[in-house]
UniProtKB/Swiss-Prot annotation:
UniProt cofactor(s): [4Fe-4S] cluster
Source domain of life: Bacteria
Family annotation (SMART domains): Elp3
Source lineage: Bacteria, Pseudomonadati, Pseudomonadota, Gammaproteobacteria, Pasteurellales
Protein name: Lipoyl synthase
Binding site residues for [4Fe-4S] cluster 2: 93, 97, 100
Keywords noted in UniProt: 4Fe-4S, Cytoplasm, Iron, Iron-sulfur, Metal-binding, S-adenosyl-L-methionine, Transferase
Catalytic activity: [[Fe-S] cluster scaffold protein carrying a second [4Fe-4S](2+) cluster] + N(6)-octanoyl-L-lysyl-[protein] + 2 oxidized [2Fe-2S]-[ferredoxin] + 2 S-adenosyl-L-methionine + 4 H(+) = [[Fe-S] cluster scaffold protein] + N(6)-[(R)-dihydrolipoyl]-L-lysyl-[protein] + 4 Fe(3+) + 2 hydrogen sulfide + 2 5'-deoxyadenosine + 2 L-methionine + 2 reduced [2Fe-2S]-[ferredoxin]
Pathway: Protein modification; protein lipoylation via endogenous pathway; protein N(6)-(lipoyl)lysine from octanoyl-[acyl-carrier-protein]: step 2/2
Similarity field: Belongs to the radical SAM superfamily. Lipoyl synthase family.
GO cellular component terms, semicolon-separated: cytoplasm
Cell compartment(s), UniProt: Cytoplasm
Length: 320
């Protein structure tokens, strides 16, 4: 009889160490991978002073960016543009989604000084728009909602003219309590990603629930009808176009007005493989459908991510 795997608190488990403990065994690290089409090949710019400045500023304050932790392909572009998505509540997630490159494990307690550190870093960077996200923290009674609220409060106190978007987890089992915590310090944009279609949730988002995520988006909108709600999807994981269109309609039916749609990219051989690469023309068609459905803004393209050019998304600019 094998000995149960025991995680050490504060240790990051990645790649095989992370995906090997997922209940649904659907990853063969030795399988042949799809070849990337030409439209998915980008030339990364050389590291610049601005990129290093952002990285050093975050490390100096003990902060994390989802750009680095999730191995985002747009990191160089966004950092060169002077933007970053801050990841609060540590860099260890209590979930182990096999599409995501963020580390899994037993996280450390939240840093009570993080809200102030975050506010000072944003002030130093002279940002006008910021996205704040987090790992899942199922170990916390409020799932981290109170910490989100404190971060928004601290950032606004030092940066009174800034626009704040929060990209939140699903606050599993604690939606009512979480939204109550956010009432005191609401964001300018509320974002929660559905990620993909409900048929694939068991293998893509173990521990999550499609209807629960819709409920979170709907109930936030009911409390704050004038704050835009936003959600993002990845394509290329085995879903059909018809299923994606149905998810888009579900989002509209629950009051969501902003959409992001991008191509899934496999972080490593130990993550879910890409089932297909969606051509740019299909992303254009998805954007047209989104406009027909009544989304106020839809960013659809191979390299689009939830917080990619979020400032342009919020102002209605074309992002693809």
């Amino acid at each position: 009889m094998s000995t149960p795997f025991k995680m050490e608190r504060g240790v990051k488990y990645r790649d095989a160490a992370k995906t090997s403990i997922i209940p649904v065994k659907n990853i063969d690290p030795n399988q042949e991978l799809l070849k990337k089409p030409e439209w998915m090949k980008i030339k990364l710019p050389a590291s610049s002073a601005k990129i290093e400045s952002i990285k050093n500023g975050m490390r100096r304050h003990g902060l994390h960016s989802v750009c680095e932790e999730a191995s985002c392909p747009n990191l160089h572009e966004c950092f060169n543009h002077g933007t970053a998505t801050f990841m609060i509540l540590g860099a260890i997630c209590t979930r182990r989604c096999p599409f995501c490159d963020v580390a899994h494990g037993k996280p450390l307690p939240p840093d009570p000084e993080e809200p102030q550190k975050l506010a000072e870093t944003i002030q130093d960077m002279k940002l006008k728009y910021v996205v704040i996200t987090s790992v899942d923290r199922d170990d916390l009674p409020d799932r981290g909602a109170g910490h989100f609220s404190e971060c928004v409060k601290a950032v606004r106190e030092l940066n009174p003219n800034i626009k704040i978007e929060i990209l939140v987890p699903d606050f599993r089992g604690r939606i009512t309590q979480a939204l109550e915590k956010l009432k005191d310090n609401p964001p300018d944009v509320f974002n929660h990603n559905l990620e993909n279609v409900p048929r694939l949730y068991k293998e893509i988002r173990p521990g999550a629930d499609y209807e629960w995520s819709l409920k979170l988006l709907r109930e936030f909108k009911e409390i704050f009808p004038n704050i835009p709600t936003k959600s993002g999807l990845m394509v290329g994981l085995g879903e059909t176009n018809e299923e994606i269109l149905q998810v888009m309609q579900d989002l509209r039916d629950n009051g969501v007005t902003m959409l992001t749609l991008g191509q899934y990219l496999q972080p490593s051989r130990h993550h879910l493989p890409v089932a297909r690469y969606v051509p740019p023309t299909e992303f254009d068609e998805f954007r047209d459908k989104a406009n027909e459905m009544g989304f106020e803004h839809a960013a659809c393209g191979p390299f689009v991510r939830s917080s990619y050019h979020a400032d342009l998304q919020a102002s209605g600019g074309l992002v693809k």
